[in-house]
Design a protein with these regions (language model features):
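Aromatic- and kink-enriched transmembrane "portal" helix at the membrane-lumen/periplasm boundary
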Residues: 55-58, 74, 78, 111-138, ...
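Membrane-proximal stem/loop segments at transmembrane-domain junctions that anchor or position
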Residues: 231-410
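Membrane-interface alpha helices of multi-pass inner-membrane proteins
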Residues: 161-175, 212, 216-220
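Transmembrane-helix motifs of polytopic, lipid-linked glycan transferases
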Residues: 79-103, 141-148, 439-442
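Membrane-interface transmembrane helices that cradle and orient dolichyl/undecaprenyl
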Residues: 143-160
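Membrane-interface anchor segments at the N-terminal boundary of transmembrane helices
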Residues: 75-84, 376-377, 381-469
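Loop-to-helix entry region of an early transmembrane alpha helix in multi-pass inner-membrane enzymes
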Residues: 59, 69-90, 108-111, 427-431
Length: 529
């Protein structure tokens, strides 16, 4: 009876029916039933090429607005996001199932891990496919990137590198922070080149390693050039579409017709938001005309935010010019009034939260301080660029503290990649995360040392470990380690962990038989995949 039940569950029809039920339940029934607007959503709806917002998602929203109209387009958006999410998850799980020759029974955990994270990060409030946020596209397309990434490191064919770089460019044009995927490309290239050259003597391998480092840097550089060029083209397209809309509105106004309503709602929503994630209150929202400018300018804003968090009362003495001293004092006063300075951070495991909130408030603090300074000094010769000058000086002065606070954000960043954070047992969350990562590294080393195990298992797991480490380090240093920035590889990591752990279980508890490993109905061929 039990064997018959297992055979039924192991059938193709049951597996895909189960997958359909999971997709409908998670992406249609859980969380917000309609669309959900977040604090940053108006910035994407505004369609004005502002700082830090790359073109794909605003274009995606605008095209839907043009096709379906103001009242329906957001509903069309969530339908399309849902379809894309399902397609990308299916593509990834099918790639894994076929690549590792899994039975349908063995594929259920792969499906479940892939579905639930990162898409349920904000549950019960929402599931990502219902959010009007870049993650609604970035999360599923990252699964497509991982297919390309894994195929490249598994097959070690340089032609796969081209497709991988192209998909990484698409990701970077959805969300600025995903430029870091170029680092994954470079790491994968180095790994493949190193593994292909292991047949040579050690001395030659070392010499080649230097060349591989240089070529990896070239891969990173080429990808970045492609990203900046594509972003520039996208911003010009946004500017052209905006200009066309303005011309139509002027013509309609001259003809005595009511003004077009297509842009009213997002403008109203944008004005009702005091601060969005990537747009300073005082910064221009003019479409960038130069290559990648609205991407590179974002790093300047983040430097300012970190500098504001570290400011001290006597830092105005670092400047000789009186006007700069006045502005610096205004910034300090505003930051101190808002209690968004390092001195107000808790000195415990939750310190990262205060650091993140403080850095995230930098834009609004700067805006308020600048406005107060202008009100008191209307004849000043300073321009807003003086803020950058102050920020650079503050960062140099407090560099050690900046590094320390960055390090304090790292532990929670690693927790976000593989586990959850609960206040009552937060120390336990740290310990569990440490155990997960240490055990994953042990499994990867074990996999490489086993001559009878296909290298795909440890390569998959090690790749996920490296990706998570890069996510945490780069996001913490360049941005700040918010959970939704770090969970891209959450479910994929556990897929790799599960596959490798299953092989450990097979070998230590069931042995071998005629070139095949027997684990009930979990049959996995040990021939070259």
């Amino acid at each position: 009876m039990i064997k018959k039940g297992i055979r039924i569950v192991n059938s193709k029809i049951v597996y895909y029916v189960f997958a359909a039920l999971i997709f409908v339940t998670v992406f249609c029934l859980l969380g917000e039933r309609g669309y959900l607007l977040w604090k940053d959503s108006p910035a994407y709806l505004a369609f004005d090429g502002r700082t830090g917002i790359v073109p794909i998602y605003p274009l995606f929203l605008q095209i839907n607005r043009m096709i379906f109209g103001e009242e329906l387009f957001l509903y069309a958006v969530i339908v399309e996001q849902t379809i894309l999410t399902v397609i990308c998850i299916l593509a990834f799980t099918e790639f894994i199932r076929k690549r590792f020759r899994l039975s349908y029974l063995a594929s259920y955990p792969v499906l479940l891990f892939s579905v639930f994270m990162p898409f349920t990060t904000n549950y019960p409030l929402s599931i990502s496919n219902h959010d009007i946020m870049t993650e609604a596209l970035a999360y599923p397309i990252f699964y497509l990137y991982m297919i390309c990434f894994l195929k490249f490191i598994f097959d070690k064919k340089y032609k796969d590198l081209v497709i991988m770089v192209l998909v990484s460019v698409i990701l970077a044009l959805i969300r600025t922070q995903l430029q870091l995927v170029g680092v994954f490309n470079a790491a994968a290239f180095f790994y493949v080149s190193w593994m292909k050259g292991r047949k040579y003597p050690l001395g030659r391998q070392i010499m080649q390693a230097v060349l591989y480092v240089f070529l990896s840097a070239m891969v990173l550089l080429v990808g970045e050039i492609m990203i900046l060029g594509a972003n520039s083209a996208g911003q010009r397209l946004i500017a052209a579409m905006n200009k066309e809309t303005e011309v139509k509105e002027m013509v309609m106004a001259e003809e005595g017709e009511p003004e077009a309503e297509t842009m009213d709602e997002p403008e109203t929503e944008t004005n009702s938001i005091e601060q969005v994630e990537v747009q300073p209150e005082t910064a221009s929202v003019k479409v960038a005309e130069t290559s990648g400018s609205n991407m590179t300018e974002q790093y300047g804003h983040l430097i300012i935010d970190k500098a504001v968090y570290e400011i001290d009362e006597d830092d105005y003495l670092l400047f000789e010019e009186e006007e700069l001293q006045k502005l610096c004092m205004k910034i300090y006063q505003e930051a101190d009034e808002e209690r968004q300075r390092y001195v107000y951070a808790r000195n415990d495991l939750w310190m990262w939260q205060d650091i993140m909130n403080g850095i995230g408030s930098g834009t609004s603090i700067i805006g308020a301080a600048w406005n107060e300074y202008l009100a008191e000094n209307p004849d000043t010769g300073l321009t807003y660029s003086a803020i950058n000058q102050i920020a650079v000086v503050l960062l140099k002065e407090h560099l050690g503290r900046v590094i320390y606070h960055t390090l304090r954000m790292l532990p929670q960043g690693f927790i976000c990649t593989v586990f959850f954070q609960k206040e009552g047992v937060y120390l336990l969350c740290h310990l569990i995360t440490l155990v997960i990562y240490v055990s994953a590294i042990v499994l990867a080393v074990w996999g490489y040392r086993r001559k009878d195990l296909n290298n795909q298992y440890p390569e998959f797991l090690l790749g996920c470990i490296v990706i998570n480490i890069c996510f945490v380090l780069i996001q913490s240093i360049m941005y700040f380690a918010m959970q939704r920035y770090l969970v891209y590889c959450f479910g994929i990591f556990y897929v790799a962990y599960y596959l490798t752990l299953k092989e450990v279980f097979n070998r230590f508890w069931h042995g071998r038989k005629k070139g095949r490993i027997k684990f009930g109905f979990w049959m996995v061929s040990q021939k070259k995949i």
